[in-house]
Amino acid sequence: MLQQLLSNAFTMVLIILVINIVYVSFSTMRLILTMKGRRYAAAFAGTIEMLIYVIGLSIVLDNLDQIQNVIAYALGYGMGIIVGMKIEEKLALGYTTVNVITKELDVDLPRQLREKGYGVTSWVAGGLEGDRTALQILTPRKYELQLYETIKTLDSKAFIISYEPKSIHGGFWVKAVKKRRIKE
């Protein structure tokens, strides 16, 4: 039966496309898990990735004489990157640090963000046109977009920069952010 499926050109293209999408999605996830320090999950994803890779590559190498198979392999690779990135966005592993600089000296913004469950450190910063409020907020990545919307609602002219911290040690943030649920 498998041989019959592989003899149909359209089915072959579809199989190669799907295999490569799944393979590259696992590859993307393995890389992200490795970068996040999740070694066992990365090793598991890598094992699945290689299993799929060997199967997919053997099918393509057995059928290199048909250009549509090579094209399906290449398209599957590109689509797999997109799918892997979408999966990673949905998982939203790790934390993000968001720095906010307000247009005005605003002591109310930190309080409003704290009431919503965010850990906020604030200070007065000197800008070109006077004093501003600067904030640093650590939040799980799954709440990052929600935080941006909250900030924009509270101060539509706020300057926002975010980055992913490599490591976090001690302090209020680590304990509180892990336990805390962000309010909508």
From Swiss-Prot:
Membrane topology listed for this record: Multi-pass membrane protein
Domain of life of the native organism: Bacteria
Location in or out of the cell: Cell membrane
Signal among keywords: no
Regions that span the bilayer: 9-29, 41-61, 67-87
Cited InterPro entries: DUF2179, DUF5698, UPF0316
GO cellular component, one term: plasma membrane
Keywords on record: Cell membrane, Membrane, Transmembrane, Transmembrane helix
NCBIfam families reported for this sequence: PRK04164.1-5
PANTHER family: UPF0316 PROTEIN YEBE
Similarity remark: Belongs to the UPF0316 family.
Name under which the protein is recorded: UPF0316 protein BPUM_0594
Organism: Bacillus pumilus (strain SAFR-032)
